[in-house]
């Protein structure tokens, strides 16, 4: 286990001459790797000063890329210094909306009533023609 760093300490290392990242609670000095990174140094620099675990995992790095992290390890992060993420929960929607049901019935009637009238007119016309 290495030295314990706070988020503020790690955040100071945020340029191309001194770049540290936090991934899975560990701190890595990736300054020497900036030029070799396949995505370019901008990708790594944009992940400084925060927990970059999600950014790292979302890319889907290979097992060899994950193994490379060991050579850049400098310590661990003090988890109490990382602000907790607030998870967004959408507001609950009612499963049944009586207002929408009323609108549906009105639209259904607006469609069916003319059809019934048309069917009645055709039926009357057909009935009166065949009896004459």
UniProtKB/Swiss-Prot annotation:
* Primary localization: endoplasmic reticulum
What species was this sequence derived from? Borago officinalis (Bourrache)
Compartment annotation: Endoplasmic reticulum membrane; Microsome membrane
User: Superkingdom of this entry's organism?
Assistant: Eukaryota
**Mind telling me which InterPro entries this protein's record contains?**
Cyt_B5-like_heme/steroid-bd (IPR001199), Cyt_B5-like_heme/steroid_sf (IPR036400), Cyt_B5_heme-BS (IPR018506), Cytochrome_b5 (IPR050668)
Bilayer topology: Single-pass membrane protein
Under what name is this protein listed?
Answer: Cytochrome b5
Molecular function via GO = heme binding; metal ion binding
What protein family does this chain belong to?
A: Belongs to the cytochrome b5 family.
- Supply the source organism's classification: Eukaryota, Viridiplantae, Streptophyta, Embryophyta, Tracheophyta
Q: Which PANTHER family match?
A: CYTOCHROME B5 (PTHR19359), CYTOCHROME B5 ISOFORM B (PTHR19359:SF129)
Q: Which residues bind heme?
A: 37, 61
Give the residue spans that cross the bilayer.
Answer: 104-124
- Domain (Cytochrome b5 heme-binding) spans 2-78
What role does it play? Membrane bound hemoprotein which function as an electron carrier for several membrane bound oxygenases.
One Gene Ontology term, aspect cellular component:
endoplasmic reticulum membrane
Keywords, comma-separated and alphabetical = Electron transport, Endoplasmic reticulum, Heme, Iron, Membrane, Metal-binding, Microsome, Transmembrane, Transmembrane helix, Transport
């Amino acid at each position: 286990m290495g030295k314990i760093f706070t988020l503020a300490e790690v955040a100071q290392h945020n340029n191309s001459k001194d770049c540290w990242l936090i991934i899975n609670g560990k701190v890595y000095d990736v300054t020497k790797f900036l030029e070799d990174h396949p995505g370019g140094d901008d990708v790594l620099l944009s992940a400084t000063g925060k927990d970059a675990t999600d950014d790292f995992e979302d890319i889907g790095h290979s097992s060899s890329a994950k193994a490379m992290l060991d050579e850049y390890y400098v310590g661990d992060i003090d988890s109490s210094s990382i602000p907790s993420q607030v998870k967004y929960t959408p507001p609950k929607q009612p499963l049944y909306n009586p207002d929408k049901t009323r609108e549906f019935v009105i639209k259904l009637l607006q469609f069916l009533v003319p059809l019934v009238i048309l069917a009645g007119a055709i039926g009357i016309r057909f009935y009166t023609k065949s009896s004459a």
